[in-house]
A protein has these predicted regions:
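N-terminal leader segment of winged-helix/HTH proteins
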Residues: 1-31, 78
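C-terminal regulatory/oligomerization modules of transcriptional regulators
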Residues: 1-4, 125-141
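Short, locally clustered residues in the helix-turn-helix/winged-helix DNA-binding domain
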Residues: 14, 42-49, 109, 136
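N-terminal helix-turn-helix DNA-binding core of bacterial DNA-binding proteins
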Residues: 22-64
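Short, hydrophobic-biased segments on the C-terminal half of alpha helices
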Residues: 54, 72-73
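Charged, amphipathic alpha-helical coiled-coil/dimerization segments
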Residues: 73-133
Length: 141
């Protein structure tokens, strides 16, 4: 059975994502967080009022609502995030970055940036720009 070009590309992209996630999580472990937790803190830090509905956060970090809940529970226990009821609707669960989460996010952003540079060091600036455009198109599609 012939393997399609699309299949081969997706296998390479999946392996690349796994490599990046493993390397970034290892680097971020000195801050006590994983790459997925970093992405949650990053998204919350960038959000208006530094809070989001749980479902919007899940979508922003490409997790299911139950997956983001499983991720947030330990983060809440160690004080990185807090959960709040929505001002307009108490049934809506909001997640906010806590002060400790802001500190960890700021400190870990330096590590994330350094590791990102190392991971992409062999790729030219033009290729990085092209890859960024391709990634944006794939994420939208």
């Amino acid at each position: 059975m012939a393997i399609s070009e699309a299949t081969e590309l997706l296998v390479k992209l999946t392996n690349l994502q796994a490599k990046f996630q493993k390397t970034l999580t290892a680097s971020l472990s000195v801050h006590g967080i994983s790459v997925t937790e970093y992405l949650v803190l990053r998204r919350l830090d960038q959000a208006p009022d530094k809070k989001l509905r749980r479902i919007d956060l899940a979508q922003a970090v490409c997790l299911t609502p139950s997956g983001v809940t499983r991720l947030l529970n330990p983060m809440e226990k160690i004080g990185l995030v807090s959960k709040e009821a929505g001002a307009r609707d108490a049934r809506v669960s909001l997640v906010a970055i806590a002060p400790a989460g802001e500190t960890i996010y700021r400190e870990s952003s330096v590590t994330f940036a350094d590791t990102s540079r190392e991971l992409l060091a062999s790729v030219s600036k033009n290729d990085r720009e092209s890859l960024s455009r391709i990634a944006e198109a794939l994420l939208k599609g």
